[in-house]
Design a protein with these regions (language model features):
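Composition- and surface-driven signal marking solvent-exposed, interaction-prone regions
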Residues: 9, 288-289, 441
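Secretory targeting and sorting signals
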Residues: 1-30
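Carbohydrate-active catalytic/glycan-binding domains of CAZyme proteins
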Residues: 31-321, 404, 414
Length: 456
C-alpha cells in the first residue's frame, strides 16, 4: 500500500470516528432563557391567603405572569397541610426539587422539625411528596434554601432555626430523602432569618436578614463550609419591614437582582435592587416601573428555565383570564374600583380583586376594548361626565360607547399602553388626583397620567 493511500485511509477513518462521536454524544443542556417563581400568597387582611405552591413565569425575570389563575399547583397532604417559603432547586441531573416550610398560616409559635419536599422533572407534575425531618430541636424549620456543594458531592439544605438564638442550620443530602445531622451553618453573633445561598463560580453567597436591625445583608465564602461566611455588604431595606432576600443571577450572566419581601407598613409587597457586580457593595434600588411581582406573592424563590420548560408550564397551567393596569408615573399604583368609582391605589390592598379586569372586545366596537370587573361581573369601566365609574351594562348604545376604548401605544412609553375613548376620540383614560377620567392630552404630565402597563 502506498504511503499516500495509507494516509488517505487514515484520515477517512479519523473522520468517521469523529462523526460517530458527534452523533452519539449526549445533547447539550438547553440554555435557560426564562424564569419561574415559586411562592405562596397573602394579602393585607388575609383575603388572598393561600398556603399551597404557586408558580409564575417571566421572560425577563422582572415582570411576572401567575399560572393556574394564581391558584396552587400542588398542596401538602401531610403535616400542617400548608406551606410557606417554597424553594425550587434545579439539581445536577437537570430535574427539580421543591422544599418548603411546613406551616399552614401565620402561627409562628409552632415548633416543627420537618420540611415539605416534592420532586419534579418539569414543574408540570410533582411526585414523591414527603416530609423530611431536619433536626430534633424544640424549634421551627423555616425558609429552606439549597445548593450543590461540589467539594462534598452533596447538596446543602440551609434553614432558619433557633438553638438559643436565631441561626441558620445545614443538613447535607444526596437524594433529599436521607439527610445528615443538622449543624450550625451561620451564626454571626446576632440573630438572623431567611437565608438564601447562591453559588457563583468558586464563591458562595449567603443573603440574610439581620433581626437586630431589620436590614438585609450579603455574606460570602470561598468554600461554602459551615461558619465560613463573612458579611461584605451594607444593610438594605425598602419599606419599613422587610425579609426573605432572593438573590438572582440573570440568564445572560451579565447582572444580578436582589428581591426583598416587605411586610410593613402593609403586608405583601416586593421590592428589588440590581447590580452588575454581586461581589461588590453596589446594589441600586430599582424603579417599580421595571418590575411587577406575581399577584399576592410572598416569600418565594426564582429559578432559570428553558424556553421549552416555559412553554410547557404555560401549556400545562394556563395564563390568567384577567389583567391589571399599572400606572406609569405612579408604578406602585394599579387601576381599581372603589365605591363604584375608577381610581389608582397603591398595591397591595384588599379586596385585591378590585384591580382585576377582563379586557374584552369593545362593547361598541370589537376592535376596541372594554374592562369588565372580575368581582362585579356585568359591570364595566365607563365614563360619565368624563369621570370613570364602574356601572352595570344596561345594553344601551350610550353605555356601550362610554365603555369602549381603543388601545394604542403608550403616550409616554410605546412599550406600555394608552386607551383612547371611543365616543370622545380626543380624550384618553388618565388619572388625576388618583381618580380616573377621560381628558384631552397635551402636556408631558397628561401623557404620563394616561400611560399604563397591561400586566397580570
Amino acid at each position: 500500500m502506498s504511503r499516500g493511500r495509507a494516509l488517505t485511509l487514515f484520515v477517512s477513518l479519523c473522520t468517521a470516528l469523529v462523526t460517530v462521536g458527534l452523533v452519539n454524544a449526549p445533547p447539550a443542556a438547553a440554555a435557560n432563557s426564562a424564569y419561574v417563581f415559586a411562592y405562596f400568597t397573602e394579602t393585607p387582611n388575609g383575603n388572598g391567603a393561600d398556603y399551597g405552591l404557586h408558580l409564575a413565569v417571566s421572560q425577563d425575570g422582572l415582570n411576572w405572569t401567575p399560572l393556574n389563575q394564581n391558584n396552587p399547583v400542588v398542596t401538602p397532604t401531610a403535616g400542617t397541610l400548608g406551606l410557606r417559603d417554597p424553594f425550587i432547586l434545579r439539581k445536577q441531573d437537570g430535574t427539580f426539587v421543591i422544599l418548603a416550610t411546613d406551616l399552614n398560616g401565620t402561627d409562628f409559635g409552632q415548633n416543627n422539625q420537618y420540611l415539605h419536599v416534592w420532586d419534579s422533572t418539569d414543574l408540570r407534575n410533582f411526585t414523591g411528596y414527603r416530609r423530611i425531618r431536619m433536626h430534633n430541636l424544640n424549634t421551627h424549620t423555616w425558609a429552606p434554601t439549597a445548593f450543590w456543594d461540589a467539594s462534598r458531592g452533596q447538596y446543602g439544605i440551609v434553614y432558619s432555626a433557633n438553638n438559643g438564638t436565631d441561626v441558620f442550620m445545614v443538613n447535607y443530602t444526596s437524594d433529599f430523602r436521607t439527610v445528615s445531622a443538622g449543624q450550625v451553618y451561620f451564626s454571626p453573633g446576632f440573630p438572623v432569618l431567611d437565608g438564601d445561598v447562591v453559588v457563583d463560580g468558586s464563591t458562595f453567597y449567603l443573603y440574610y436578614k439581620n433581626l437586630s436591625n431589620g436590614l438585609l445583608y450579603g455574606a460570602r465564602s470561598s468554600t461554602g463550609a459551615p461558619n465560613s461566611y463573612t458579611t461584605y455588604t451594607s444593610g438594605l431595606r425598602q419599606g419599613s419591614g422587610m425579609e426573605a432576600p432572593m438573590l438572582v443571577r440573570n440568564n445572560a450572566g451579565t447582572g444580578w437582582w436582589l428581591w426583598g419581601d416587605s411586610y410593613s407598613p402593609v403586608n405583601n409587597d416586593y421590592y428589588a435592587w440590581s447590580s452588575s457586580n454581586v461581589g461588590g457593595d453596589s446594589w441600586t434600588v430599582m424603579n417599580q416601573r421595571a418590575y411587577t411581582p406575581p399577584l399576592n406573592a410572598k416569600h418565594g424563590s426564582i429559578a432559570g428555565i428553558t424556553a421549552s420548560e416555559y412553554n410547557g408550564l404555560v401549556s400545562r397551567w394556563g395564563l390568567p383570564n384577567w389583567t391589571r393596569l399599572k400606572s406609569s408615573n405612579f408604578p406602585d399604583r394599579y387601576v381599581r374600583h372603589a365605591d363604584y368609582l375608577g381610581r389608582i391605589d397603591p398595591y397591595p390592598f384588599d379586596p385585591y380583586q378590585d384591580q382585576q379586569w377582563r379586557m374584552v372586545p369593545g362593547l361598541a366596537d370589537a376592535a376596541g376594548v372594554s374592562f369588565e370587573s372580575v368581582n362585579f361581573p356585568g359591570r364595566y369601566l365607563r365614563h360619565s361626565n368624563y369621570e370613570i365609574r364602574l356601572d352595570a351594562n344596561d345594553d344601551t348604545a350610550t353605555f356601550r360607547a362610554d365603555a369602549t376604548f381603543y388601545r394604542v401605544a403608550g403616550l409616554t412609553d410605546s412599550a406600555w399602553s394608552s386607551f383612547r375613548s371611543y365616543n370622545f376620540p380626543d380624550r384618553y383614560l388618565r388619572h388625576f388626583d388618583y381618580l380616573l377620567r377621560i381628558d384631552p392630552i397635551s402636556t408631558a404630565t397628561d401623557r404620563a397620567d394616561a400611560t399604563f402597563r397591561v400586566t397580570s
